[in-house]
């Protein structure tokens, strides 16, 4: 009986991992939101966020998880952000140290700005956990558009991330997200270019 239970759990875990690994999210279509939020930690993320703002798909950009020692001018130079864009539309969040604190930092910024819709930018393999953490922190009614930066993760990266996702959901009391609304992707052919860039 115990062996059957263990075998069943192993199968559930294995199928869950396969589903996670083979259904990574895609870049989002041309859809307007109040803001775009970028979580640092992977190439292409910041470039994607900047492109979204420059195309007028979001009013402002918040970069969560920037090193506290990085000054706005240094950030602008590293990522080639035009001064006009940096001054009007880019805010650096420098308190977060992991995905959960990203969610807290983003939530506070959105509340301060009174924004109710946001484009979430992170790497494709990280999106599920990032969205899970956001769903537990964001105010009810917040609309979220997942905008994944495509990557080519190896098996080790996927395995580690899947286990982090499970741990995050267990610590939250199992998957949440009913309080926020995922924005439907309606124009899959019109996606921003991946671009270059990386974590701050």
Predicted regions: what they are:
Residues 7, 37, 48, 164-167:
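Hydrophobic side chains within alpha-helical segments
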Residues 21-159:
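A structural signal for short, hydrophobic/glycine-enriched beta-strand patches
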